[in-house]
């Protein structure tokens, strides 16, 4: 064979060719199959002609195995602690609730065991008509209730209405709740004349509580609504919760005089405004009488 340059290239014989060339030549001639052209799946023993097809088929098997594993995990662990549950509101012997909800009267006081206190800020207009869980923060367990105690709510003043004493706005524990119980006490500081009202002001019949705020809209800046809610105490956190209860009681004792002073100051400001309005009205009446007498030509009174 001669190339355009004039060089001779000897032709290789079959013996001098490489083993790879010989193998592919035999494959083309329908001889021995090398390299193998059939790929078998190890799971279903299905044969494929190319490695790419086998790889896609193996991806299907991987997805199926992942789904089976996920189904097994859900069967072993059906409930996860991260997802919150909502109440069914059914009258049965075992009532399961796992978070804070709207204020509901208790129809079965025998379920009272222990209670948590939740604080709702009344200064914001969004939390007044609807007591949503986003404005509720859990407190600590307090005193126990007897079976004869009626359901009620607690309204008490706070030192700073913008501050809600909790670590997170939705921190109610996701444990089993038996029932909800509350006590209503209204603490307006009317210059030391009125005392705390008992729970007789709360209606004892009904499923949902209707809060009659009355004339407390001016005082809502420095008031918080405290809802006592029953939760069973867990065994691992009993000592820590008891210590927190003592600290919270001490803080309330220290904060009570300052809270009353805030109410007194707000009421005194309101009374000053009323007296000023009365004085200005009285002076206006005097000037009207003087103007009328000047028009008629009579002498003005000497007292003015």
Curated annotation (Swiss-Prot):
InterPro entries per UniProt: Plant_dev_regulator, Znf_C2H2_sf, Znf_C2H2_type
Function: Probable transcription factor that may regulate cell division and growth.
Comp. bias regions, Low complexity: 147-157
Domain of life: Eukaryota
Other remarks in the entry: Plants over-expressing ZFP10 show are dwarf, have abnormal leaf morphology, flower early and are sterile.
Cell location: Nucleus
Species, as recorded: Arabidopsis thaliana
Organ and tissue specificity: Expressed in roots, stems, axillary buds and flowers.
Name of the protein: Zinc finger protein 10
Region of interest called Disordered, as start-end residue ranges on this chain: 71-91, 135-157
